[in-house]
């Protein structure tokens, strides 16, 4: 592909026009203790302290960066693009953290250019150099940002020679098309943020319940998130082949929830990101809908109960010692009126009797104070750690059939997973009300509209869309992955407060190519995901700062004009991205899953075009037409 220069000049550093500054960053606990501190690292002058904090605290590689580097010699790779390794020729190399944003921009753009060159994506070496420079310029000027796993993982091997033993990943070799087990943890990075994984109703075999926790851990370790539709798991009322009843959906969801809570995505960066989806006809759907509501009620009980118990038990202790009676009489309610009064007050507030008696015996032994932990409602507190359901986004998958049953106040059958028999019949409206109440009470579960989602599915011949990633912007086949990038709309606004469409289209084209290259270079946590990601090559290009963009134009966010702006920008981005995809296909060939789905792919494209032009009819294969803008 030919790459034009819009922001940079050939044979000149893309940083030439950018001023840099030295800043510091730290994280301090409420008690004043220091969690993190990095001084005198380099960022572009226009960067805010928040942006600097995020880069240093989250995205800088914290260890293993050599103080001196040398280029390797790789066949058919230009010397300027060759991977680097530690230069220990004089025995004085040391290892530390990244300390400059330029290091990060260089390793990201360099790795993408390197793999793009290996994949034959550039028409010439000059095009590769233009790509390398344009990407670094856009990163430094906050015009575009990739998803977090790219910042965490991409380029560590290419830029610094960082490596480690394989973690059980797989990839498809772009030259041979052969599914291959990774021999390294970083030579091929894990750049994808969003995964959708399947689960079978099987306890210990590949693809089953326990195997999913291993696959999830492999993703969380490198900073990615995952979603799964758990509706294949049988309900608690269903039998087992060996006799007895199943533990049910919820018992296994609690295991996965606890496992996710124990893992920080990216090792030191954030907690695991996880989506749990359950179909609206699952036998255990009612318990699932109420899960977080019930758990948050437990938190309220823990917080309130701990404070009530602490207050009354300390009062009982004080009554035992602030006593004018003699000896043992102080510990007998009949002879110590103050103690009797405190015991009655504690019982009225449901303080457990065994705790009341325990404190009296404790005081009798000569102790004059107790420690009884109290808790608060901070989301990261011990109270929330104690309960389940706090480490995932939960969503209910609803069909048009269910929504019509709600509207018509009909019955709704909950279906057993093993034999498809009816487990229970409920009123659809009552179930819908439970969803609404739970979402109001604790913001979960969300709703995924199964019928509409699959009406816009570009590859339905390959299977239904059954779930999404944790944030729900990625919806596709099970066992696939998507890597994301977002364009900062404010940086594409011209002096007339309008979108500079030429620069925007240029950026969309380049970043579509980056995401395509990322599929080629990536490794994946399972054979199935590696295979299907290679065959379908999904990518997720979007934009950020829409609110700031509209505010700068003086357009209300929730207005017809605001929505029309959003629709137009989205249509332009989508169109250019698909056009770039077609350009890549003309040189590299279409993705392997295209031929089977070409009819539906083009149908969805025609529907996108109709929506872009505000059509109200002529749509193909839709149950509900989109709202025109």
Which residue ranges define each predicted feature?
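Extended catalytic cores of very large enzyme megasubunits
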Residues: 1-629
